[in-house]
Amino acid sequence: MAGYLRVVRSLCRASGSRPAWAPAALTAPTSQEQTRRHYADKRIKVAKPVVEMDGDEMTRIIWQFIKEKLILPHVDIQLKYFDLGLPNRDQTDDQVTIDSALATQKYSVAVKCATITPDEARVEEFKLKKMWKSPNGTIRNILGGTVFREPIICKNIPRLVPGWTKPITIGRHAHGDQYKATDFVADRAGTFKMVFTPKDGSGVKEWEVYNFPAGGVGMGMYNTDESISGFAHSCFQYAIQKKWPLYMSTKNTILKAYDGRFKDIFQEIFDKHYKTDFDKNKIWYEHRLIDDMVAQVLKSSGGFVWACKNYDGDVQSDILAQGFGSLGLMTSVLVCPDGKTIEAEAAHGTVTRHYREHQKGRPTSTNPIASIFAWTRGLEHRGKLDGNQDLIRFAQTLEKVCVETVESGAMTKDLAGCIHGLSNVKLNEHFLNTTDFLDTIKSNLDRALGRQ
């Protein structure tokens, strides 16, 4: 723990006069600080701010390098900084997480470093006041929206499903259903009923679910028209942004009322708000049964958005991540129903195992690509909102450089293991350590930008 604090405080000191655990939003470096850092005179000017949410452990260290070496030398941007590192969340009673989400509502774009969600062991390690909730969950509850996960394709990284030559983006409706259900064990014979009592005082509705002859289990779950509608809007807007077709999967043949409501709301919103834009972009929307959809996904080459209910999205997103090769090559973007507000982050965690090695002074080979893409996806969206083509081009160039660097043979250990097997790879023969890989990306980016 002490080592962790020393590292993150030294990082904060290195980035200027910013206090290590300030709960308020902090801006990007002053012009005087930028001069000291020898930033280029002709950086891309960005008119409006981006919210930056710092994180924990190994990803925090990598995040700092990305910002200082890959982003700020080329982009003149005001960053509204929030330290979501676990010590600061504890110090501010998690108010910093709430503040960061409210700032995202105000400025429309946020980039987020991976953060620790504490369990009992973390409470003890960090001597926390309490077991704070997942910051992602807190942010999602304030912003609403849908989390879209998309793989980063590198041609030389083998895929468990070789036919997936284009990305498949999965949108999970992270609200209700089994995750907010009430379940119970029936320990004897009896009748299980559902009751709905209208607020307007009209008649109570009652359904007999099952008459248990002996013990068993039961469950009641729900969702709301408002949440389903927000999910639908996010999915349609994301598909238009990507210019990819959208598929929505349910089991409405079995859950005729429950899943049927998802199907009907999606269709109504599509017909009323999005059909014209879909036709203009030559893409389409289609509802499919979940079992048929799973089969079609495995046979497809990719290149579409898949809208899933909560449980389906939980399961299928992990299948997609593994099928495409690595969680280190998976982006995650929270898209709000307004189509304007997003929060981009890596799909993986804080890479604790590598951080423990780093604390001992040992080099690691930690994959930074998903964290880099969190920055690029946020900056690209800022560019689209502001009509800043230079910023869009920069973000796309950095993404292209990351992919081309891996495809040229320079990569981290996790990716080399996908090709050769983890037990067979050797440092500097098959993979680079973290710093050398990031330096390689920096050199390649500088070269690519010099050509433009």
Swiss-Prot record:
One of its GO terms (biological process) is tricarboxylic acid cycle. Homodimer. The lineage of its organism: Eukaryota, Metazoa, Chordata, Craniata, Vertebrata. Keywords: Acetylation, Glyoxylate bypass, Magnesium, Manganese, Metal-binding, Mitochondrion, NADP, Oxidoreductase, Transit peptide, Tricarboxylic acid cycle. Acetylation at Lys-413 dramatically reduces catalytic activity. Deacetylated by SIRT3. PANTHER family: ISOCITRATE DEHYDROGENASE [NADP], MITOCHONDRIAL, NADP-SPECIFIC ISOCITRATE DEHYDROGENASE. The modification N6-succinyllysine is found at K80, K106, K166, K180, K193, K256, K282, K384. It comes from Macaca fascicularis. Plays a role in intermediary metabolism and energy production. It may tightly associate or interact with the pyruvate dehydrogenase complex. Substrate binds at T117, S134, P135, N136, G137, T138, I139, R140, R149, R172. This is Isocitrate dehydrogenase [NADP], mitochondrial. GO terms for molecular function: isocitrate dehydrogenase (NADP+) activity; magnesium ion binding; NAD binding. Mn(2+) binds at D291, D314. SUPFAM superfamilies: Isocitrate/Isopropylmalate dehydrogenase-like. The modification N6-acetyllysine is found at residues 45, 48, 67, 69, 80, 106, 155, 166, 180, 193, 199, 256, 263, 272, 275, 280, 282, 384, 400, 413, 442. Its EC number is 1.1.1.42. Residues 1-39 form a transit peptide. Binds 1 Mg(2+) or Mn(2+) ion per subunit. It is an enzyme of class 1 (oxidoreductase). The record marks Y179, K251 as: Critical for catalysis. The keyword Magnesium applies.
